[in-house]
């Protein structure tokens, strides 16, 4: 090397330049003269890096760094830069190990304590050294391109991430940039990483090992070539190592990479501006045991290469072991499922063997879903039934089954069991003769098939349509539950006797006999409540209670009369007592008569089918009293004491509701008119004698307070109260 070149190298080292290269000073000056824009870009980049040195604290801000400080400042064509980033992240996002390798490249050490999974486990790792201690990712790519031009062997060991797009310019449409920006954002924020295949892991291992070997070879070659001075060893050895300092297996390292077409030099040579100020480019620390590396550390401080040997990758043997364990677990689960299926099949075969074929199967009574045919099999049975009917007309049709009991009416209530069930009896001798084999009650079943008038089969109309014969040879059909679509329609129910198959399959059914069709109609009850004589006993209990109330009224009247001796004269008290006794006697007579009338009326309308929702709850329209209104006496007896203290008389019914005089009278009229207008309607419970206690107390108070007036308005005694909420016992069969 010439003296001028050595002086230049010494001058560069004295100026604290940590990125030495093997170019001479003239080349550096040419680079500075030819690429002033690149120098300015690098100056701006380093200034921006210093500004955001303390702002980047987590992995999520990597997107902003890549877009703002790498793409815009160091790549002249923004569209090309986005294409590179997009392809690069599409490659590394498929492999967790590649993501960890990338973190190591940019200065992020993966957390060895955490378990490596298929997710981005290190999303909160610090990347503060990404900008402050490292140059841009494209600088590394540029160096790799220079190295690959000289070393073609290294290009076969790295992954191929070429960009096939042509060289672009600054006039790229904005929407293209935004679309690519969104793609990069998705790749950066996408945490559901795919599981790494074996091939990618093997390629990563080979690439990393080959890169490390090439690094060592290049370093040794450089050390053997240069023995002139320490400066030459440091400068040239450092440059050779810097060429291979970024063995990024995810970037394109072949000669056809479009990075050469990008404007602006991204190499690591020192860029000298107009003021001859040297701009340093920072790199992260690395671990290298080579002599030249240690000498460079003593001289250059922070400048280092990146060694990927500390990255722990799962070995191929471990991966094979994990796959084998998973396969063994799957095989074990499959074997368990096969064993369960075999056990179930063995149990079914044992049950069939215990049955021993037709005539030897166990007796089944009641509804059994296991003997019921499927809808498809039911269609086959119906076809066989039609063939049987065509061959055997009704006049000459032999029959081994007989319907010995059927409902009293053809009405089938909605969601109700039949009031009287169908009972079908089988004649085993006739059935055995028809089937040509000895049959028992357990080997014959009966099926109820519902069809419409046109003979169309209604599969979904009957819930339980298959019954087995009991020991007496009877099959009981009581659970005929009809669906909603059958309400209000008339259907035909036909019973057929079928030989019960051993394998519970009706693909080839043997029909023994077919009964005559029975008409059924599905209706809905307006009032499904069934009334009985307990309602009359309820009225009787009310009358007994009313008589007890009358006796209590007499005692209360006597007590009230005794308490008023201080205010009235003895003669007046005696007269009041006589009047009260007479009132009580009249009340008792009327109460008894009213109770008997109520019993007669309620007993006559006991079987009414109207619902209780039609009871009147409002008073009739005001106006003239109709001619059909009942002649009702609002006073029970002629008393001579008008009211003085009470302004309105109230009446309390048995349900605790209080009515005034006018409202009570209106309710009574409405009840009587409703009964006459609708004789078949819901019987309104006219319960008397429940209000005598309060009414008689009011009457006695009125009689004792004012003894001069003989008006009978104060002694109005209502013996009838309308019970609007009467509890009715509900029984269903």
Swiss-Prot record:
Comp. bias regions, Low complexity: 13-51, 148-167, 286-300, 542-616, 633-654, 689-712
Composition bias, Acidic residues: 231-245
Compositional bias of kind Polar residues: 1-12, 246-258, 362-372, 713-733
Signal peptide: none
PANTHER family on file: ORGANELLAR PROTEIN, PUTATIVE-RELATED-RELATED, VACUOLAR IMPORT AND DEGRADATION PROTEIN 22
Stated name of the protein: Uncharacterized protein DDB_G0271850
Region (Disordered): 1-52, 145-174, 219-303, 347-374, 542-658, 676-733
Record organism: Dictyostelium discoideum
Domain of life according to the entry: Eukaryota
């Amino acid at each position: 090397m010439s003296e001028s070149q050595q002086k230049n190298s010494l001058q560069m080292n004295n100026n604290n330049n940590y990125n030495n290269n093997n170019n001479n000073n003239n080349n550096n000056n040419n680079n500075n003269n030819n690429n002033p824009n690149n120098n300015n870009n690098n100056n701006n980049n380093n200034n921006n890096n210093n500004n955001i040195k303390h702002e980047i604290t987590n992995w999520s801000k990597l997107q902003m760094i890549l877009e703002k400080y790498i793409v815009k400042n160091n790549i002249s064509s923004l569209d090309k830069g986005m294409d590179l980033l997009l392809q690069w992240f599409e490659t590394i996002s498929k492999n967790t190990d590649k993501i960890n390798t990338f973190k190591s490249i940019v200065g992020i050490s993966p957390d060895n304590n955490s378990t490596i999974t298929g997710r981005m486990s290190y999303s909160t790792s610090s990347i503060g050294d990404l900008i402050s201690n490292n140059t841009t990712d494209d600088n590394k790519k540029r160096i790799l391109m220079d190295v690959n031009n000289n070393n073609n062997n290294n290009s076969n060991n790295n992954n191929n991430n070429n960009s096939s797009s042509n060289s672009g310019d600054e006039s790229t449409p904005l929407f293209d940039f935004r679309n690519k920006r969104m793609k990069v954002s998705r790749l950066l924020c996408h945490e559901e990483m795919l599981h790494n295949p074996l091939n990618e892991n093997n390629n990563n291992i080979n690439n990393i090992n080959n890169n490390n070997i090439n690094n060592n070879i290049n370093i040794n070659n450089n050390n053997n070539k240069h023995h002139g001075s320490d400066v030459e060893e440091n400068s040239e050895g450092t440059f050779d190592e810097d060429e291979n300092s970024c063995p990024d297996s995810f970037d394109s390292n072949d000669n056809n990479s479009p990075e050469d077409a990008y404007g602006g030099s991204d190499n690591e040579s020192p860029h000298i501006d107009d003021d001859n100020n040297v701009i340093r480019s920072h790199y992260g620390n690395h671990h290298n045991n080579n002599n030249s590396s240690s000498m460079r550390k003593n001289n250059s401080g922070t400048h280092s290469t990146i060694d990927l040997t500390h990255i722990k990758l799962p070995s191929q043997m471990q991966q094979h072991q994990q796959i084998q364990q998973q396969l063994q677990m799957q095989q074990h689960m499959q074997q368990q499922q096969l064993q369960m299926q075999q056990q179930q099949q063995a149990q079914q075969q044992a049950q069939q063997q215990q049955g021993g074929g037709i005539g030897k199967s166990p007796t089944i009574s009641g509804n059994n879903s296991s003997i019921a045919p499927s809808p498809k099999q039911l269609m086959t049975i119906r076809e066989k039934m039609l063939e049987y009917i065509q061959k055997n007309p009704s006049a000459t049709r032999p029959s081994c089954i007989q319907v010995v009991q059927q409902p009293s009416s053809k009405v089938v209530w909605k969601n109700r069991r039949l009031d009287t069930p169908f009972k079908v009896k089988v004649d085993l001798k006739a059935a055995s003769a028809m089937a040509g084999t000895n049959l028992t009650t357990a080997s014959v079943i009966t099926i109820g098939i519902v069809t419409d008038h046109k003979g169309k089969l209604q599969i979904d109309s009957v819930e339980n349509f298959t019954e087995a014969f009991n020991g007496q040879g009877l099959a009981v059909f009581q659970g005929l539950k009809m669906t909603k679509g059958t309400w209000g329609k008339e259907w035909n129910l036909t019973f057929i006797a079928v030989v019960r198959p051993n394998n519970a399959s009706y693909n080839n059914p043997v029909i023994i006999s077919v009964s005559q069709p029975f008409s059924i109609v599905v209706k809905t009850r307006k009032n499904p409540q069934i009334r009985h004589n307990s309602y009359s006993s309820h009225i009787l209990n009310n009358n007994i209670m009313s008589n007890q109330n009358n006796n209590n009224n007499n005692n209360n009247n006597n007590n009230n009369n005794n308490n008023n001796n201080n205010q009235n004269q003895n003669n007046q008290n005696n007269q009041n007592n006589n009047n009260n006794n007479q009132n009580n006697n009249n009340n008792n007579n009327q109460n008894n008569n009213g109770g008997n009338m109520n019993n007669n009326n309620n007993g006559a309308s006991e079987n009414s089918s109207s619902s209780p929702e039609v009871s009147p709850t409002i008073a009739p329209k005001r106006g003239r009293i109709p001619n059909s209104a009942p002649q009702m006496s609002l006073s029970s007896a002629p008393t001579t004491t008008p009211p003085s203290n009470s302004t309105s008389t109230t009446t309390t019914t048995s349900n605790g509701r209080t009515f005034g005089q006018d409202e009570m009278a209106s309710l009574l009229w409405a009840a009587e008119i409703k009964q006459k207008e609708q004789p078949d309607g819901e019987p309104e419970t006219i319960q008397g004698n429940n209000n005598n206690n309060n009414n008689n107390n009011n009457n006695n108070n009125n009689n004792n307070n004012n003894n001069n007036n003989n008006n009978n308005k104060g002694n109005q005694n209502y013996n009838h109260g309308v019970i609007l909420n009467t509890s009715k016992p509900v029984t269903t069969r």
